[in-house]
Amino acid sequence: MKLGALSLCVFASTACAFDIDDFLDRLDNTLTLSVFHDNVRARLSGTLDLEIYHFEQPPPGLINSSIDTLFNPRLTLFLDTQVGSQIYFFAQSRLDRGFDPSNHGAQLRLDEYALRFTPWDDGRFNLQVGKFATVVGNWVPRHLSWENPFINAPLIYENVTPIQDKSAPVSPLNFIYGLYYYEKYAFNPVIWGPSYASGISVSGRLDRVDYAVEMKNASLSSRPESWNVTENGFEHPTFSARAGFRPNEAWNFGLSGSEGPYFRREAEPTLPPRRDIDDYREFVLGQDASFAWRHLQVWVEFYEARFEVPRVGDADTFAYYFEAKYKFTPQLFGALRWNQQLFGNISNGYGRSVRWSQDLARIDIAATYRFTTHTQLKLQYSFQQETTGPGDDNHLIAAQLTVRF
């Protein structure tokens, strides 16, 4: 009797999923527009993400919540417009509780918008202007919920460090221990997620080599509100670049670099006398590789970063991760990621050399089941631990249901 009831529930759920899938297919056709003999094509699409997190306090990464269990819904809309073969425009807007998971109220944002000009069909040159993700590294192309094997980002993109962009430390000890006294969002990671800063980029592909160079209005570590050109102009630009080499279809190698000031304008009064924002910069050097063979995909990134910190000196850090995804069936795949971030030493102002933040390691395990071409469920467990100092740890359990249309 119980087996029959369970079979009936599974059958009903599957039938319901395919009914929704059929509706979303019809919706996709409705949201696609083509005019002027197909010379102008526009498509509106999106994803609805329903996320739930359970963690220990303080919350890991960029999660901003005073409660241990957080429900985080997000509606993302994409607009893609192609005019002829040379002009392309895209935009991304979101309705959620903040750029990063939080227990704040709802907010509507325009996260990305850009105009791209491609004069030649072979893709050797593209000129792009607007607000868009950084060209650095190989994680950004898969950072959206449908493509990302995990619910969160690698450690380097979300681990908050003692770096502050709104004020300068008054002493080395204030710099080292600031994380214990101020709320987490006063501080910055090395790279803040996909870094949707505003600017201009040039990119292209020449045979087996691809390249991208960008000038942005904010550094890779900058917070989301700094990415808007109305909030932060181009007085102190950041320059980033990536060069990639693909020897064959399976392998892809890349080298990235970035350099620019990381302080916001309001930090200027807190800087030492006769110093300005341009005197303190963030330097990032990155190496990445990816491999794909049959049902297996592997990604790896290494980052070396240096922050020039007032009254402290150079603060160096090294971070890396290995990520693997395996497709067990056309609908089920699993993923495993190992992350680590190590911090260098600075003078504490009293003749001793100390680590400027605790080294950290994290393992992420995730499984995704794709019910249809429009719906998927993702489950994740993460364990994070300090490998130096007191050895604090944190467990994260998360689930994400995504509907794509």
Language-model regions, residue ranges each:
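Bacterial N-terminal signal peptides that target proteins for export
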Residues: 1-4
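N-terminal periplasmic/intermembrane-space "pro-region" immediately following the signal or transit peptide
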Residues: 6-61, 118, 405
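Outer-membrane beta-barrel pore domains
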Residues: 19-23, 56, 61-64, 103, ...
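Outer membrane beta-barrel
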Residues: 32-54, 65-221, 235-240, 244-252, ...
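Glycine- and other small-residue-rich loops at beta-strand/loop junctions that grip anionic moieties
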Residues: 191, 232, 313
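Short, contiguous, pocket-lining structural segments
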Residues: 194, 201, 214, 231-235, ...
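C-terminal/domain-terminus segments
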Residues: 215-236, 387-402
